[in-house]
Amino acid sequence: MTHNGTDSTDLIIVGSGPAGIAAGVEATRHGLRVLLLDENAAAGGRVWQAIEARGAGDAEEDNGLAMIRELLISDARIHHGAEVWCIEPYGAGPGGTVFWNENGAARSARASRVLLATGAIERPMPIPGWTLPGVMTVGAAQIALKTAALVPDGNSWIAGQGPLIWLYAVQVLRAGGKLGGILDLSDTAARWRALPRARRAMPDIRKGLTWIDEIERAGIVPLRATSLQAEGRGALSRITFEVKGKKQTEAADLLLLHDGVIPSLQITRALGCGHVWHERQRYWRPVTDAWGETTVPGILAAGDGAGVGGAAAAVFSGRIAGLGCAHALGRIDGATRDREAAPLRLEREKALASRLFLDVLYAPRAFVPDDATLICRCEEVSAGQIREAAARGCQGLNQLKAFTRCGMGPCQGRMCGATAAEVLARARGMHTREIEPLHTRFPARPLTVGQLSELEQEP
């Protein structure tokens, strides 16, 4: 497919979070023509979302704001509100054509290199009652806080594990919001397993302890809990959980869940990129070389979309990918590329040091959702239906579509794929990495017939 007005450029970057911004700055600095596409209204991704409008809140956000401003004064062309729905790699060489929707119209552009900086998504956390109105993710609530200054009030609870629950709780309290409580669902034994990696993660550990201290000084004592359930008729009204084996019930009209993040793989899967299993955090990530290039020539991945490492590491991986593109397209020689990349690699390793600690401390907990718990919200497929399909011989997620329609709804498996794989693997007595992942296909976003008709078949 191609569009009558197909543009041509050196590098197209999909996503304007830390990795995409850094790659854009680095690539334009070396003379590449850069087109940056992002579905949000402004640059920053999730971690620096709406930072231009609300201002920086700490030193890390100061650095992010400075990078965004550097990108804005560069020669990069930036398109916001651009939803990428297809990428067609060149058959004869690296690069490809990118198709996206913008202002209701389909557009396309060609590039010698395409960098995917699509970030991460929250890991699904299907507890009983998670589909009730009043239950949402911490990430979604944080977006509401950053973009619209909306904060929880009344009987609002945070539950789960990972740094985000502590950061968000502090942000809520500083913004004048109220919390009923925080449930820490992490594994107590994981603290001891993570201890050998703590020394290199001390700056982040101190930051986390400062957050927890601020939360406790506000009168909120986090509870270490298990067996969480959301309950209510038509909407959330209470939560039940266990603390030291004793069941407790609390009134709640908002429950915010979080169980870490995993790479967003919809585009890399659809492109046919190779992927490798990350055992500690139980997710797939694209295979990349030292410069971020995937197994599809000319298609690169950087940042959390190439493996969750956090914002600081994403910045350095984006800059390294930008250098790789500049060399591949003849703007700098190999010696210059390697010399400039060397300190970036060292800084990235420093940034990733704390990630090794966090990966063990907040390793995904093995869970066994009861048969009635919905796994696929779009098609209303329960854990019990997945187990029944396994008993009937279902061997992978693509077969599961035929058995149950799991993964065939509007989200195309983004919300259920990881959980469905875990349930199916356990039911079949297999490791999750042995379960065939979903075969994702383009279009990656909803597309109208009218938008599609604006494109014509290439002769």
Set out the residue ranges of the language-model regions:
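Residues forming the flavin
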Residues: 2-410, 414-459
